[in-house]
């Protein structure tokens, strides 16, 4: 028995990651899929990614490390999600799964249409499936109710579910009525070497030492708390004459930010960068002293980890899974309310002043003499100022922050934990169709019957496609050798 288990654990798996959210788009899901795939390849597995086309980027592309990506042409709807069609994608997914000898289909993000459709088609083909949820959703609004019902349908017949935080796990278990035993909490991570703090003595702006710079990198949408940001910036700028904001990202709330900047004449203190690429993130972060996150709901928030790794102090709303992400000494929490965000950001600004001047007592005098701040008044303890003195508290220095984050988060560890889930799923016996239909039927009095109809039609299509296009006649894609790739790459950069 032991030898059988050991041989199963050492198997090389063929994994297909499916999501609507992938590079060249940037975000937490995109970063997770890319980095996790790279580390799984290094662990000896075969990984391909399937996503929809981005502009003129379609067809098959190879990324670094031999990661193969299928950019499938598909009509899009709001938020970069593909148009739901249920069955029209079956043939192309089937061809990809057969060509790549896929054993496990791993879908990412509840908002991804490709993810739901790929899992449905994979189960009809008898493949093992895993789902990773990257978001938190409510239970009261119409969109949440509909998506939760769809999620329950998809997850009724999934081998295992991964959530990026324990809060997200509880949320997903409730939304989809799942057995907690088949749900695991595996967080995101970062490549710490890509988010090094600014070297000591390095000057990016000639007047940078005069300013306390607050960085905001986010999609400019309601869910990310942009309304709170719009009302908080003028109050902070009124109180602190040496504070400026750098905001990166795009979204419908950019108009509100531009109007706020015009109304309060803050053009020289609020910089809007627009859409940024992944390669620009570190360069923007090291320009700042504080990273501000105003999200109304968040399962993990990879942005605050990247900011802490670059040595920034973090101010964040205390929502969702954020309290699980970083130690308390690295960030200042605030309620998702205007007054609380202003108060928390104000306290952190004074800490930065103390860190920059290394004169905590002088900053404390500034606090007591400041009369311009409107309500609420800052509540700053002696401990706040003691913590801000980087001379006496090395664990609060930027490089110390980086080292702590580096020790906490590693994609290699995440890949190992994900691999453990795969080996668990691959050993689950395949249930008969009638058992799958029983699971779908339990999704609701009306919805259950509809889901059963969808599953039966999908199964019949699978049978029809096998008659028309037998799997034996589909050409298998040649294997990509990571060893040869590394050898050729080495000879290219270091010719003999």
Please give the residue ranges for each predicted region.
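N-terminal subdomain of nucleotide-sugar transferases
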Residues: 1-57, 61, 65-71, 388, ...
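Nucleotide-activated donor-binding/catalytic signature segment of Leloir-type glycosyltransferases, i.e.
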Residues: 256-276
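Aromatic "clamp/platform" in nucleotide-sugar-dependent glycosyltransferases that forms part
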Residues: 296
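Carbohydrate-associated surface elements
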Residues: 53, 167, 189
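Short alpha-helical donor nucleotide-sugar binding micro-motif in glycosyltransferases
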Residues: 275-276, 283-288
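Short hydrophobic beta-strand element within catalytic cores of glycosyltransferases
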Residues: 313-316
């Amino acid at each position: 028995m032991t030898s059988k288990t050991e041989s199963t654990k050492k198997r090389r798996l063929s994994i297909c990651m499916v999501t609507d959210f992938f590079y060249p788009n940037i975000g937490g899901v995109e970063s997770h899929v890319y980095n996790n795939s790279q580390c799984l390849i290094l662990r000896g597995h075969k990984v391909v990614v399937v996503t929809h086309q981005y502009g003129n980027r379609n067809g098959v592309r190879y990324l670094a490390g031999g990661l193969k990506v299928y950019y499938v042409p598909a009509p899009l709807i709001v938020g970069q999600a593909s148009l739901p069609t249920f069955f029209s994608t079956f043939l192309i997914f089937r061809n990809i799964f057969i060509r790549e000898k896929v054993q496990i289909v791993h879908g990412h993000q509840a908002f991804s249409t490709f993810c739901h459709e790929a899992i449905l088609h994979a189960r009809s083909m008898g493949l093992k499936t895993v789902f990773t949820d990257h978001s938190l959703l409510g239970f009261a609004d119409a969109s949440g109710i509909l998506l939760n019902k769809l999620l329950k349908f998809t997850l009724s017949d999934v081998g295992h579910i991964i959530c990026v935080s324990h809060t997200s796990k509880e949320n997903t278990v409730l939304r989809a009525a799942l057995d907690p035993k088949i749900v695991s909490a595996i967080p995101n991570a970062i490549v710490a070497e890509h988010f090094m703090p600014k070297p000591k003595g390095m000057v990016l702006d000639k007047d940078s030492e005069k300013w306390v710079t607050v960085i905001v990198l986010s999609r400019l949408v309601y869910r990310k708390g942009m309304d709170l940001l719009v009302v908080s910036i003028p109050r902070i700028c009124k109180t602190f004459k040496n504070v400026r904001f750098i905001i990166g990202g795009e979204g419908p709330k950019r108009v509100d930010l531009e109007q706020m900047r015009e109304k309060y004449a803050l053009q020289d203190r609020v910089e809007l960068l627009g859409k940024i690429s992944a390669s620009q993130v570190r360069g923007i972060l090291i320009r700042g002293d504080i990273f501000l996150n105003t999200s109304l709901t968040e399962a993990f928030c990879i942005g605050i980890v990247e900011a802490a790794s670059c040595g920034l102090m973090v101010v964040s709303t205390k929502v969702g899974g954020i309290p699980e992400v970083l130690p308390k000494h690295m960030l200042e929490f605030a309620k998702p309310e205007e007054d609380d965000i202003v108060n928390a950001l104000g306290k952190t600004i004074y800490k930065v002043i103390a860190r920059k001047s290394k004169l905590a007592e002088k900053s404390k005098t500034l606090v007591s003499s400041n009369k311009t701040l409107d309500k609420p008044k800052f509540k700053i303890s002696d401990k706040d100022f003691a913590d801000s003195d980087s001379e006496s508290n090395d664990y609060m220095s930027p490089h110390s922050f980086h080292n702590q984050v580096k020790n906490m988060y590693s994609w290699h560890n995440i890949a190992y934990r994900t691999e453990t889930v795969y080996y668990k799923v691959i050993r689950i016996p395949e249930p008969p169709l009638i058992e799958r239909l029983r699971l779908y039927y339990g999704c609701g009095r009306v919805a259950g019957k509809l889901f059963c109809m969808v599953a039966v039609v999908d199964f019949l299509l699978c049978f029809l496609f096998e008659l028309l296009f037998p799997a034996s006649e589909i050409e298998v894609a040649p294997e990509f050798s990571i060893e040869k790739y590394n050898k050729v790459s080495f000879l290219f950069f270091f010719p003999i």
